[in-house]
Structure formats: C-alpha cells, structure tokens
Amino acid sequence: MASTYSFDVVSDFDRQELVNTLDQVRRDVGNRYDLKDSNTEIDLEETELVITTASDMTLQAVEDVLRTKATKRNLSLKIFDFQTPETAGGNRVRQVVKLRKGLSQEIAKKLSKMVRDELKKVTVAIQGESVRITGKSKDDLQAAIQLVKGKEDELDVPLQFENYR
C-alpha cells in the first residue's frame, strides 16, 4: 500500500471536442437565415480562434452560437478569452479568441496558497503548468478536491483533476 497519495490539478480542454464544436457552429451559421449571407469564417489555430464576419451584430450572434454549442459539448466557457473586435478589410469585423490552456504561474501560486492555508495535512508543489497535491490519506486529497472545486469560480480557468494515485 502506498504511503502517500497524490493528484494533479491542470487546466486543459479536449481539442477534438473543440473541433466538433466549431464544425457545429459553422453548420449552424450556414443554416441560420440571419447569418447565411454574412460570409462568416471561423479559423482554428494552435492557441486561438479567429472569427471574421460582416458586422458587429453578426459577430455577437456567432459568439452566442459558439458559447451555446461549447456548453452542449461539455467545454467550459472559461477556455475562451474573447479579445476586442477589430475592423478587417472590406467592411468586415475580425475577433481573436485566445484559448486558455495550462495554469499560469500566478494562478498556480494562488491555487497553491489557497490549498495550503485551508488544509495543513497536504503538500502542494507547482510543476510547470500543473499543481501536484500530495497527502498521506485519500480523505485529505478528497477534501482538497472539494476545496478547489468550491473555489474554482474565483479562478479564470477551468480545472481538471488527473493522475489520482
């Protein structure tokens, strides 16, 4: 039997679910009467989405469709960081949507401090873009998971728990 148990807190999303969501959004935009002739393009790059469309109003509608479809596919809306729209050539509007992945040092430190202040029986270590929480009993780790889930709204990133051992 192991003398210590641990798990990792990470911020990640399923890229394939995002691709499927964007396919649904493109299909929905192509079928909707008010968006059909807007010539909307949604491009997925490595760390961001680029939405190019005809006007601010259609951009808002496309954002709404994106949020709805992402929610239906169990993607957290916290992965989307909507930047300010900018004008593109030919009376078009472009918006960059950055995709949040991984815990920044600032968020990892905040999470680490939060767990250390509340639970004295666990140790917290920041490991790159994840936070490892270690404890002698599984009950302590369950308490840490409940604490982090309860405080997740204070953080700007979605959290997942991996490598529970």
Swiss-Prot record:
What InterPro entries does this protein map onto? Answer: DUF520, UPF0234-like_C, UPF0234_N, YajQ-like_sf
What is the role of the protein in this entry? Nucleotide-binding protein.
Single Gene Ontology MF annotation? nucleotide binding
Q: Which organism is it from?
A: Synechococcus sp. (strain CC9605)
The protein's matches in PANTHER family, at most eight in alphabetical order, are given as: UPF0234 PROTEIN YAJQ (PTHR30476:SF0)
Cystine crosslinks: none
- Metal-binding as a keyword of this entry, yes or no, is no
Record's protein name: Nucleotide-binding protein Syncc9605_0652
List keywords of the entry alphabetically. Nucleotide-binding
